[in-house]
């Protein structure tokens, strides 16, 4: 049974769905009572993909969870966010983060100290939206940036993705919200405490920092199929530099096979407990119970990230099967 509390849905840019179908999913989520729909930027452009979601909906919040800040200058991010917030009538939320350094290097992007870059990036976005004279930092420097139309909300919410303690503390200090990911409820509770403490230290009201947590969700009545689906997504995350600290397991053979392109072999070597730690899997009752654990850990908005079951993305099933207020 899912409670009537806030719930979000994430649609992956690499789901293979045409943008129009993503919009249809967003409308279905809105009709089912979801509070927010996000685009997760994998290989596509999350900000561009927010357009069809906004066009298809009328009340649900739409945002990115997340967009890779390194891919776009902060002035461009601010201009795009202002347009999306205007188009949505004030429903847009900008979720930012950094892909891992190896991926950004692959894209030919310059490397900067992550904390400094994120803090300055947010400052530039806010300066542009507020019409301030400019910003001068160690990485970014801008003059006043004109916009064609005044922002619908000069203070539109900016959320930061954070995994480690330093980025969590930065989010608590400067962001409107934090986006957690790849965490067990226990790890999420620790992250919540870090964010709240940092907000208080900065003289902010801790509860004003929204805690969003992406919950990978593999929904299937066949428990074994759901467990397989949960394990199948681990190799992709095993290559993330933070994997050892996130999963508490070296995952050496999984990483070796994944780097060699043997994804099937990598999946076979995934310890089930690693997948269990951050994936809600099983039938609606099992997934719903797991999501409630995140709420008890202090998460304000769990965001369901549907995981393929035997190769098929179960968006429609997740939207209806785990809808807010639905009993199972």
Question: Language model features by range: what are they?
Answer:
Residues 1-328:
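Active-site-adjacent structural elements that line small-molecule/cofactor binding pockets in enzymes
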């Amino acid at each position: 049974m899912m409670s009537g509390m806030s719930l979000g849905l994430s649609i992956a840019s690499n789901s293979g769905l045409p943008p129009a179908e993503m919009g249809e999913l967003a409308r279905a989520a809105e009709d089912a009572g979801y509070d927010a729909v996000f685009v997760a930027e994998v290989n596509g452009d999350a900000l561009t993909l927010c357009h069809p979601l906004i066009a298809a909906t009328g009340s649900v919040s739409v945002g990115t969870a997340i967009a890779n800040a390194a891919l776009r200058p902060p002035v461009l991010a601010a201009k795009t966010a202002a347009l999306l917030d205007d188009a949505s009538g004030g429903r847009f939320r900008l979720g930012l983060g950094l892909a891992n350094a190896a991926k950004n290097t692959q894209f030919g992007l310059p490397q900067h100290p992550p904390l400094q870059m994120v803090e300055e990036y947010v400052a530039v976005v806010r300066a542009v939206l507020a019409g301030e004279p400019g910003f001068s930092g160690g990485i970014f420097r801008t003059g006043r940036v004109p916009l064609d139309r005044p922002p619908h909300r000069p203070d539109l919410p900016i959320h930061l993705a954070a995994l480690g303690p330093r980025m969590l503390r930065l989010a608590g200090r400067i962001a409107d919200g934090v986006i957690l990911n790849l965490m067990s409820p226990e790890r999420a509770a620790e992250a919540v405490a870090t964010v709240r403490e940092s907000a208080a230290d900065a003289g902010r009201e801790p509860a004003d920092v929204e805690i969003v947590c992406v919950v990978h969700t593999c929904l299937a009545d066949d428990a074994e199929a759901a467990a397989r689906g949960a394990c199948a997504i681990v190799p992709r995350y095993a290559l993330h530099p933070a994997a050892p600290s996130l999963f508490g397991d070296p995952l050496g053979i999984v990483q070796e096979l994944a780097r060699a392109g043997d994804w099937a072999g990598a999946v076979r070597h995934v310890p089930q407990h690693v997948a269990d730690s951050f994936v809600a899997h099983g039938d609606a009752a099992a997934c719903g119970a797991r999501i409630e654990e995140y709420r008890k850990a202090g998460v304000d908005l769990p965001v369901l990230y549907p995981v393929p079951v035997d190769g098929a993305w179960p968006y429609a099933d997740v939207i209806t099967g785990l809808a807010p207020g639905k009993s199972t």
